[in-house]
Amino acid sequence: EALQSIAGYTCYNDVSIRDYQRHTSQFVPGKNFSKTGGCGPFLKLASSINNYQSLTIKTILNGEVMQEAKLDQLIFTIPEIISYISSFTPLVAGDIIVTGTPGGVGDRRDPPLYMKTGDIVEVEISEVGKLVNPVLDENIIL
């Protein structure tokens, strides 16, 4: 039933503001800054995807693949995520659910790898598309 409620799939650049993310044990403070979550470039209709679990998601930093995994490797399936979220908040048409990121996060690398002004970040999902975002200095963000 949960899969029938999905209009489509898109890319989302799940940016983290690490210093705020460390204020608590939860990720929320570091995930909800204005103008930090790029989405798009378009919505691929769910009806045009035969098996979402076969899709591959990649994060590419300056041309180098940093993260890559198939959606069947998610800790929780998309129906499980929808079911869980709908257990504590109503979901309505237009809501976006972001599933998270594959292994390979820069903060967990040895040594850690942090994005800097001028970097180019790409989030690509096979059969869905590619979102390309530049990393800008926070003082010049419009």
What is each of the regions a protein language model found here?
Residues 18-142:
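Catalytic-pocket segment enriched in acidic/His residues
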